[in-house]
């Protein structure tokens, strides 16, 4: 029962807020958007044959800022300021952190992860036996960002290594919900079981574990630069989203197994199984550090992705462009440096974890950003794919409603 998976989703798949006046055109946009979201939500419920708690979209455009939500019979009210676990959208934040360090001369994207941190005698990753996983000496920071490093994914993939048919992360979270995960914990398994997808730049394979390794690199680089022990979460707070960052946001990246409580107000996730249902909110996010442990709101994700892609946040416009376009040689889709290209929607990321599905994207051509939240997984048959596809279709329909 793979209820703890967190992954990137397929790339192919009544009121207005500040910035909108009360003229008739804007009122019509809101009415039309409400009707569109309600229709998509109703169609999803019909297709799944079950109640869907809610479906929400937050869109910022030259024509105004709009929010619309449709609630099922058993759903809770959602606002742009409701907190939720935004899962693999975290990878875009991790990429931003790496590129920020690149801008500041703290690291080089094409350094091997066994190289020393610039200006120090300390390597990017621990030089100990348990970290000698396959191809470690060949892997660069850029390749991990691009999912071209060949690093086996211990949280999504049970094909090469599993415990009773479950991924390592699933098994540990099921048997010991309070287990404190770490990058060292994961890489030891890679080493002990010789787990790999192949040599770098020969295969594209999405890897949560790769991004957890990046979180360790961020922590080690930051610790060296400030001469104090720091974590991934410390850098994210100090430099990317905290009060002293360019665009402060109340986004958090829980690292402790015990840090399970979401801020208020928050939306609970919901998972539907063949035999039972599960409400998800109090969860151990330490299994997903750097790749899926982010917590925030739709409004926060919108401000983040919009300012980031416009070069108005911590990254220069040139760095944001690099994030969008720098694909690996083995990549066959639109994935750059922790950034997806969603056709008809824009650049950003998406995510799925424990009853939550979400998407954030910005389209430079139209200056439109969109965030979609569906706090629901249906694990019966092939129904989860229908839920995932709804993220993209909602974003596309929302843009179309505003004329984009």
Question: What is the meaning of each model-derived region?
Answer:
Residues 1-29:
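Bacterial Sec-dependent N-terminal signal peptides
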Residues 8, 59, 120, 148, ...:
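Residues that line or immediately flank small-molecule/substrate-binding pockets and catalytic motifs
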Residues 20-76, 202, 221-224, 230, ...:
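Catalytic loop of the DD-peptidase/beta-lactamase superfamily, centered on the K-T-G motif
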Residues 53, 75-143, 196-209, 289-292, ...:
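Short active-site loop at a secondary-structure junction
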Residues 59-61, 65, 113, 255-258:
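Short, solvent-exposed turn/loop segments enriched in Gly/Ser/Thr/Pro and often Arg
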Residues 126-346, 350-352:
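Short, surface-exposed loop or secondary-structure junction motifs
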């Amino acid at each position: 029962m793979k209820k703890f998976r967190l992954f990137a989703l397929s790339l192919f798949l009544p009121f207005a807020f500040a910035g909108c006046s009360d003229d008739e055109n804007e009122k019509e946009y809101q009415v039309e958007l409400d009707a569109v979201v309600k229709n998509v939500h109703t169609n999803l419920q019909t297709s799944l044959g079950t109640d869907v708690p809610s479906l929400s979209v937050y869109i910022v455009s030259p024509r105004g800022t709009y929010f619309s939500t449709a609630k099922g019979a058993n759903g809770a009210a959602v606002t742009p300021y409701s907190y939720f676990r935004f899962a693999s959208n975290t990878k875009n934040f991790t990429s931003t952190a790496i590129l920020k360090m690149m801008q500041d001369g703290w690291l080089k994207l094409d350094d091997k992860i066994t190289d020393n941190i610039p200006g120090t005698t300390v390597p990017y990753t621990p030089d100990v036996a348990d970290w000698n996983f396959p191809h470690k000496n060949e892997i660069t920071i850029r390749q991990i960002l691009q999912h071209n490093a060949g690093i086996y994914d211990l949280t999504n993939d049970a094909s090469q290594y599993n415990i009773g048919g479950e991924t390592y992360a699933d098994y540990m979270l099921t048997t010991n919900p309070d287990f404190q995960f770490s990058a060292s914990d994961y890489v030891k398994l890679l080493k002990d079981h010789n787990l790999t997808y192949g040599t770098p730049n020969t295969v594209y394979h999405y890897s949560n574990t790769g991004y957890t390794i990046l979180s360790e690199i961020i922590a080690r680089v930051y610790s060296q630069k400030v001469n104090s022990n720091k974590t991934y979460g410390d850098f994210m707070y100090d430099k990317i989203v905290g009060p002293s960052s360019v665009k402060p946001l109340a986004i958090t990246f829980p690292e402790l197994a015990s840090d399970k409580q979401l801020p208020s107000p928050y939306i609970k996730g919901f998972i539907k199984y063949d035999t039972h249902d599960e409400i998800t909110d109090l969860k151990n996010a330490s299994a997903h550090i750097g790749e899926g442990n982010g917590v925030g709101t739709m409004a926060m994700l919108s401000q983040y992705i919009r300012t980031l892609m416009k070069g108005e946040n911590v990254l220069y416009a040139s760095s944001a462009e690099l994030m969008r376009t720098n694909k690996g040689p083995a990549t066959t889709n639109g994935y750059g440096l922790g950034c997806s290209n969603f056709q008809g929607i824009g650049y950003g990321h998406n995510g799925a974890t424990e009853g939550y599905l979400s998407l954030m994207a910005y389209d430079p051509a139209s200056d439109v950003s969109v965030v979609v939240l569906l706090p629901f997984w249906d694990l019966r048959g092939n129904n989860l794919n229908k839920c995932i596809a709804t993220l993209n279709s909602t974003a596309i329909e929302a843009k179309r409603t505003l004329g984009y």
